[in-house]
Amino acid sequence: MNPLPDAFRNTALAHRALHDDLRPENSLAAAEAALAAGYGMEVDLQPSSDGVAMVFHDATLARMTGRDGRVRDFTAVELSQIQLGESEAGIPTLSDLLSLVAGRVPLLLELKDQRGGQGGSDGVLEAGTLKALEGYDGPVALMSFNPAMVEVLAEMGSAWPLGLTTCDFR
């Protein structure tokens, strides 16, 4: 098991980056604001139809974009052109975020459950996430509510710390 980097213990994390009415959640503008404030970030990942890890919370586009459809039904290029809220920014890829952050603050990446009910995993989001992280030099940890996704990450040989997110645990 890979230990959690010390940076996670010493840095506050902005949930979905530092967002507000002008900077949509999980956007590069929200990430820039978190960086400027000295915060690390927790962001959410969904897969595109071509297997790219996209920085987006919901499985569907409606709440954040006003568009119909599931994130996983669009390519990364198509998603990058879909406007987030009232901003002019499109949905960023994980690679976009990593380029912006460049190892300066810790990133906690939540891989969103793709099957519902924490069922199995097809491995698409896990593979896209690990591909984006290849060669990245900065503090990162990966987590999911779906234990199967955490298991797939481990089986794929993730060099990053892995965690299981939970709630109402008794």
Predicted segment positions?
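Phosphate-group recognition and catalysis centered on beta-loop-alpha active-site segments
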Residues: M1-R170
